[in-house]
Amino acid sequence: MKKIAVLTSGGDAPGMNAAIRSVIRMAVFLHCKIVGIHRGYSGLLEEDFRPLTNRDAGGIVLRGGTMLKTARCPAFFDEDNQKKGAQILRNHGIEGLIVIGGDGSVQGAAALSSLGIPTVTIPCTIDNDMHGTDETVGHDTAVNAVVGAVGRIRDTASAHDRAAIIEVMGRFAGNIALDAGIACGAEYILVPEVPFSREKLARSLIGQMKEGRTNSIIICAEGADDGRALGDWLKERTNIDICTTILGFIQRGGRPSARDSILGSLLGAAAVKALLDGQITSLIGMNKGEIRILPYSEAAKEKKIFKKGLYTLAGILGAAQEDEDIAESGL
């Protein structure tokens, strides 16, 4: 291959720029022209392209967001638009495409591959919910952002003898809530993978207050419950002063952690090598510290396995062990 392209798609995640930088530098090192596509698949359909050089990679590794911009593009699920995108790439002489993003981005890349465009994907999402890699680019930074925020919230909750609900991202996967909850010592962690009982949670909070615990941290993934609604319900049910914080996009932005910068750099370089070596139609992930190249067909077979052992540990370390388990049923 003499000319390849790179795009970022879907939700942004810290470390995307590290991956882009690595893709550019490795492509240039291997004497391959590299083209950037702005705003993901939307930019592909609109032919919003620009040539990239080593100079474009300068100073971006520690920046959040993505220098190529990103967008969600529901239109790209349409087969006619997929064919249009493939033809546009051919018209520009682009022989391969590196996609940086999450599950939806993989679907778009797989569609282009089925139309004869060689593609590889770098898993990049704060949710860490992609099968085929132990960790996705952006997850570590998001977890650190939550841990930092919870530390500040606990200080003020403690000063006022309050319980605090912190709602974090994770509609279908509770990895941010689980990892951050373990790291910051949350008393309760609510995730979509494990339905919980509001009533049991209320009884546990009341029991904790009677035992002298004047504040508790409840980390709630958005897919487990609505944080504000839960807070209002618990206030009425328990008469405990409860504050609710929705962290929102603070989890996506900011300088990537060293871990995410390194991971993005490793996967970016590996993606270029895989594409040029013909290891196409693949997800480039990390498994037990080693680069893993997984065909899309295998990556799409199953969802990432929920960390049941870590969730059980969270219950032991948190308040739930002292009262009844708040889960509706055991794992």
What kind of region is each of these model predictions?
Residues M1, A27, G59-L62, L89-H92, ...:
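Solvent-exposed alpha-helices and their adjacent loops that cap or buttress functional pockets
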Residues L44-L97, G104-S105, V137-G148:
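Glycine-rich oxoanion-binding loops at beta->alpha junctions
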Residues M1-L45:
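N-terminal phosphate-binding or glycine-rich loops at protein starts, especially the Walker A/P-loop
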Residues D226-A229, L234-L331:
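C-terminal non-catalytic interaction/assembly regions of soluble proteins
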Residues S9-D12, C32, I37-S42, R72-C73, ...:
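Short, ordered loop/turn segments at secondary-structure junctions
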Residues V99-G101, A111, H139-D241, T245-L247:
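Accessory alpha-helical/coil subdomains and C-terminal extensions
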Residues A18-V23, D103-I117, A177:
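Short Gly/Thr/Asp-enriched flexible loops that form oxyanion-binding sites at enzyme active sites
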